[in-house]
UniProtKB/Swiss-Prot annotation:
TM stretches of this protein: 2-22, 34-54, 56-76, 102-122, 147-167, 178-198, 210-230
Protein name: Uncharacterized protein YqgA
Subcellular localization, as worded in the UniProt entry: Cell membrane
Gene name of this polypeptide: yqgA
One Pfam short name: DUF554
GO cellular component: plasma membrane
Protein's membrane topology: Multi-pass membrane protein
Highest taxon, organism lineage: Bacteria
Organism: Escherichia coli (strain K12)
Keywords carried by this UniProt record: Cell membrane, Membrane, Transmembrane, Transmembrane helix
Record's signal peptide: none
């Protein structure tokens, strides 16, 4: 039985609850500065993943086509609508952030928690090897990340633990079918595309550039097939 997804989801859940409880006691300067630090950390992780790229054209094409599909399907608009409805469930919060700021930050952390290369690879790795160490290490970071964001976004951060658990359990259980079909170069290109998404997420959290990160998610589905095709036809 896999345990990593449950540990990771619990870390987000507890971090979100603790952050919401401490929101009135944690100084604003710490919350603001730490949010920027987490954005910077996301940028750093993204860079480390991007440099692993094995086939640059495949990575670029997957990102471009994935973003195009996301734009056509209006993925981020759909998420924004769902998040706006979720926000209405927490109107009793004493310190409710502005609607636009809430939407932007909430969408960013959904991607940060649920679509990070570390989480996806960690879940797949545990599904194949039974080793939960990657997800356990990620849980420490996610606990403090959730706590900091919950100070400004409230208990809604804890809700992210539900899709996080579902995604990671699905990946872990499907890993036995997926990983035998992959090659090291496919995994490298998949990680590189995830790194680009983390770079976009980091820039978004820092407020530098509001990339439509959710619209870029289909790129993750295209990364491995395009990498395999590029290797077969051009490498």
């Amino acid at each position: 039985m896999v345990i990593g997804p449950f540990i990771n989801a619990s870390a987000v859940l507890l971090g979100g609850v603790l952050g919401a409880l401490l929101s009135q006691r944690l100084p604003e300067r710490i919350r603001v500065s730490m949010t920027s630090i987490f954005g910077l950390a996301s940028l750093g992780i993204g860079i480390l993943l991007v440099v692993k790229c094995a086939n640059l054209p495949a990575m670029v094409l997957a990102t471009l086509l994935g973003a195009l599909i996301g734009e056509i399907c209006l993925l981020e608009k759909g998420v924004n609508t769902a998040v706006a409805k979720a926000q209405n469930l927490f109107r009793h919060s004493r310190k409710k952030p502005a609607h636009e700021s809430f939407i932007q930050n909430y969408v960013a952390i959904i991607v940060l928690f649920c679509a990070s290369g570390t989480g996806i690879f960690g879940a797949m790795n545990e599904g194949m090897t039974g080793d939960p160490s990657i997800l356990i290490a990620k849980s420490f970071l996610d606990f403090f990340t959730a706590m900091i964001f919950a100070c400004s976004l409230g208990i809604a951060v804890s809700v992210i633990s539900i899709p996080l658990l579902i995604i990671q359990l699905t990946l872990a259980w499907a890993a036995a079918l997926i990983l035998p079909l992959t090659t090291p170069s496919m995994m490298a290109d998949f990680s590189a595309v995830g790194g680009l998404l983390l770079l976009a997420t980091g820039l978004r959290i820092c407020g530098i550039k509001m990339f439509p990160v959710v619209n870029m998610l289909p790129a993750l589905l295209l990364a491995m097939p395009l990498s395999a095709a590029w290797t077969a036809w051009f490498a």
